Amino acid sequence: MAVNNEVNNAASETPTDVSSSSQKLATEETALTNGADHEEEDGGEAGGEVFQLTVVLPREPHKIQIIVSSQEAIHDVRQSIIELPGTFQYSCFHLEHKGERINDFVQISEVPGLTADSEIHLVEDPYTEKEARIHIIRVRELIGAAGDRTDTLNGIISGASLLDSVTSKESSQNGTSTAPSHPMVGFDFQGSGNLSTLLPRAQEPGPKTVKSISVSPWNPPPYHLRQKGHLLYLQVTTNEGEQFQITSHVSGFYVNKSSTGKFDPSPKSAPKAHSAHSLLALLSDLSPSFEESFKGLQEYNNAKEPLATFQITNATPSNPWIVPSATAPLVAHQADITRTQENYLIAGIENSETLRDWNEEFQSTRELPKDTVQDRVFRERLTSKLFADYNDAAARGAILVARGEIAPLNPTEGKDAQIFVYNNVFFSFGADGVGTFASEGGDEAARAAVGKDVMGVRMVNQLDIDGLFTPGTVVVDYLGKRIVGQSIVPGIFKQRDPGENQIDYGAVDGKDIVASDEKFVSVFEKLSKALKVKKHAVWDKDAKRHDLEGSIETKGLLGTDGRKYVLDLYRVTPLDITWMEEVGTALDSPKEADAASESAYPHRMTVIRPELVEAYWKVKMREWVNGELERKRQAQKAVEPAAEGKEIEAATEASEPAKSEEPTENGELAKKSESDEAAEPSKPDQERIDIGDFKFALNPDAFSGQQPQTDEEKTEFAEDEQQVRLVCEFLRKTVLPELVKDLKEGDVGFPMDGQSLSRLLHKRGINLRYLGQVATLADGKRLESLRILAVQEMVSRAFKHVAGNYLRYLPIPLTSSCIAHLLNCLLGTDLNAAPKPDVDEAIAALYPEADLKFKEVTPESLKQEIEGQVLRRFRYTLDSTWTAGIKHLQLLREVSLKLGIQLEMKPYHFTKQSQTESAAAPPATNGEATKEAAPTGKSTNGKKKKKNAREASPAAVVSANAASPVTFNPDDILNTVPVIKEASPRSSLAEEALEAGRISLLQDQKKLGQELLLESLSLHEQIYGILHPEVARVYNSLSMLYYQLDEKEAAMELARKAVIVSERTLGVDNAETLLNYLNLGLIAHASGETKLALTYIKHALDLWKVVYGPNHPDSITTINNAAVMLQHLKEYHDSRTWFEASLKICEEVYGKHSINAATLLFQLAQALALDQDSKSAVNRMRESYNIFLTELGAEDKNTKEAEKWLEQLTQNAVSIAKHAKDVQARRNRGIRVSPRVTLGQTQVQPQIGQTVEAAAGRDTPRGLDSRSIDELLKFIEGSDQSNQNKKRPGRSNPKRRGGAAATAGK
């Protein structure tokens, strides 16, 4: 395993000590080179002493100093040396101290006599073949000679970042004489999305250091020369055009006498003899221009944001759905002979180095000690890397299975029943190939089960129960096929003796036989307790009773390695009986006989979500606590009534896990950290309640066909079923209405696309099958956006299922034709009402057995199929005109992301009008962001600039001018990528430190809080690596916390990192990325870089147009913020325009007479005064006053404030306007917007579903907060003399949002 990790490290450009960079940026304290730990959150174990070491080198610069921690491993120090600019020519060496070799895997503290200012010596080692290959790969990457790697998994420009492009565009505009005064000039609020927003700008290539470097045709060395130490032969062509044949020898590298036609690998004689231990040094000797060009390449690379260039090793890179054309400079295919040799260089001749025993690695990692903090860091770090490696390998294998590249182990079985083994991963299809789910819904049930199994495995991995093991599990959706990849559990294929069960715990062969091996009771008991599963009875086919700790479907297997494995975790929660009875899939349901009908729900695997169980448990627990308090109160008459609040709080604190701001997808909340508990003030005994007496658990086998035998069993089972029914009713009667109410009142962050809507529903414990009910509940103007989004999500999911049916058994070369035709039938009917499929008949003839039924699809038949799927899956009837109301671009994005489609970036014409309008328009550029690439849907951005014709690629010219009769052609589908579901656990240690830091800040322990936050940052970076979604979320969370602490420089740096990492791992147009851009803009404005801030906000608004379209409810406050920033730049007239735009959206969403509109009218009136439009200012203030008077009454503070302003404006409008200008600078110190105006998602837009108060860093109740108007009045009157750089009050601070770094809405 270590061997493979070294190969991976060597092949990666990611420095291991990058974590220190963020520590240096986040604080002025001394940072640790390799991310050494700060004082730990439990106060028990320090991160180790930090000191400086001197490393003595064999060549210049002869000595370097590095900062290390006594707790670091020597291996980490070694890796740091490899990555430092002055020493990266070294890769094959060991370290010595006082002449003694130091073991790479011991900690620094374990090396005798190694203290501060000690000297260690770097000693070059003889190469092995493997070390030589690693060295060559590394040098190729360092000198820029490595082309793009062959990648069968990740798509075109995967892991791209746009931040450099966004920033450089603003810089380039500022450098011109005709530059606009600010980035918002000419912004079209109602314009359609511009696809070029999603692509990075084309960049000039870096300087070439050598023409080529590759493995020589003479490679590998013959036997007799291997005996003499020859390892590899290379061929190098320098920039001067000279070609050299180089021998890689155990002693280093030297130029040999071979030529293209003659083999003589002996060293050349003087004066042409050149040799060196490092290939980098040898190239410098051979090429006079190498040094200068290599220096230029380093400068070129240093000009880029480092995070945007590092290889992503611990996460799956994001795959954009819009990509440059195949001929664009960003993706142009280059000749590189070594690309075909890379597998050999990485894995050797036998290719055996990449074969890993995944199961053994998973389980041995789980068995690592976790007693100390250092143990936990090492264990979680290894776990994170292992899951990333496995997910990558399993996804690659799944694609090969889907493409038919791997032979099945059982070729005589039906296609869906075939199984495969590749790269030590076991693959099967997510279909009911052998009839296991025949009674549950067949293929549809099997497909749902494997998806839920991944979620169950992730939950168990997160719980980390000693002695219980799970196989590595990944589900891959690719071109309509669902493929499951699992690590091979020892003994799972073992033939059992007669009478011996294949499974040791749970159901065997359906549910006829039930195994209940006592060995599994203890571990399953822990699992069930954590998942709130009740121990219950089940009965086999002979009516024999078995008491199981978990669901009968959850199986235990004793592996031949002696470990206890838990399998089939798709039923860890009970069935949603209310839904099943409604749709007729419940057992004994009168509708069940019609289950095969077109309108019947497709399967019976409709379980409730773990988050719902968690939410219901909290409700019941609070009820129980209140009951216990009442009982105590009756028993202790001396207790004061005022203590009740404290008692409830104490009980809640004692009973609930730490309030991590976001339940995970599997519903498990982060554990409360020890610091958290330590920080709590001690409570009197009488105020505490032992919640150990509170019992709540659900029977997951309720309503699943169990047959109790005795009356007592029947009574208990009926009680279990009633408890499950209550949970289902809680979902419908409480959770769903509360969510809709929160969104209606603007109290939480509003979703902006299907992914964020799904995440919000899941976080609340709502299954996506309730999208139809969400759409039905979204009644009225205020919830129109939610209804449109829910309908769009149902349509896109229905299209995914329809397309999957056509794609599943289609040969790969015909899939582009199928996808293009289906997209034309869905989105291109306004341009062509009867599109014809474009199929290459010559290719189709090669597959006589292929099912080409997609050719028969028409827009009408597709519409009917989608309506049928929406009705079946969501119980929602689309109205007859739904196709007229779809948002073309947004729906295209949704279906592309769900199917993994990568489309060429070009103007897509959805209507005849748009095609006519853009017929004369110049073509889109290859990867540069320009207005011309706007897809032409129902609205277009009319402001177009002339293009330089030389920027356009030939392919783009043809596609733009060809006047195609259809919207999509097969050539537009450039690639399809897999959609991956995986089971990686999150780091509990890093989350504990983050939560402890946040709690310390809330308790005004600023120094301790900052130390813990830095500790959490260091842990996140160490455990996940720097490029990971969880790290992006902690960067964003910490940037907001530092922003509130007035640490603007640190906040800015962290916010930039949050943007880049989320772009590269979540997507350039992901909702979290968009929100990160908005936060970055706010922090940039607070740091005095208002023009740059407006650039970021403009980019976010451009993304919004693509993701949602114009007029998103959350954009009200974003536009309002931009208006205030424009005031800061003294652009009063433009600022007024932006306030008016914000008001217009607010009136559309909330109504003209809403309090939100009144507050915006109040601000607009001030903006009009600044713009010297006194008459309009008076009118707007009067409107504001009238609304406040009607809605809140004459005595309300807001009404009085508006009345006061109205009087002042009316009495002396000119004087007020002048006065307002005088205090404008003070006013712009902070962006102050009423919380009702911000709708719960503004300067600190919540991570979809976060409350306004939590986001703004305050704990006030919901409702209109008159302080914002009061404070604004003080600003305008000049009574607040704060300077611009003073810290913002907590209430106007941005929301903390994002994944593990946001406070979830209750």
From Swiss-Prot:
One of its GO terms (cellular component) is cytoplasm. Residues 1-11 have a biased composition (Low complexity). Residues 1285-1298 have a biased composition (Basic residues). Residues 12-33 have a biased composition (Polar residues). TPR repeats lie at residues 1032-1065, 1074-1107, 1116-1149. Residues 336-580 form the Clu domain. It is found in: Cytoplasm. One of its GO terms (molecular function) is mRNA binding. Residues 1-47, 630-689, 912-956, 1275-1306 are annotated as: Disordered. SMART domains: TPR. Residues 656-689 have a biased composition (Basic and acidic residues). Keywords: Cytoplasm, Repeat, TPR repeat. Gene3D superfamilies: Hypothetical protein (hspc210), Tetratricopeptide repeat domain. It comes from the Eukaryota. SUPFAM superfamilies: Hypothetical protein c14orf129, hspc210, TPR-like. GO terms for biological process: intracellular distribution of mitochondria; mitochondrion organization. It holds the Pfam family TPR_10. CDD domains: CLU-central. May associate with the eukaryotic translation initiation factor 3 (eIF-3) complex. HAMAP family: CLU. PANTHER family: CLUSTERED MITOCHONDRIA PROTEIN HOMOLOG, EUKARYOTIC TRANSLATION INITIATION FACTOR 3 SUBUNIT EIF-3. mRNA-binding protein involved in proper cytoplasmic distribution of mitochondria. Belongs to the CLU family. This is Clustered mitochondria protein homolog. The lineage of its organism: Eukaryota, Fungi, Dikarya, Ascomycota, Pezizomycotina. The gene is clu1.
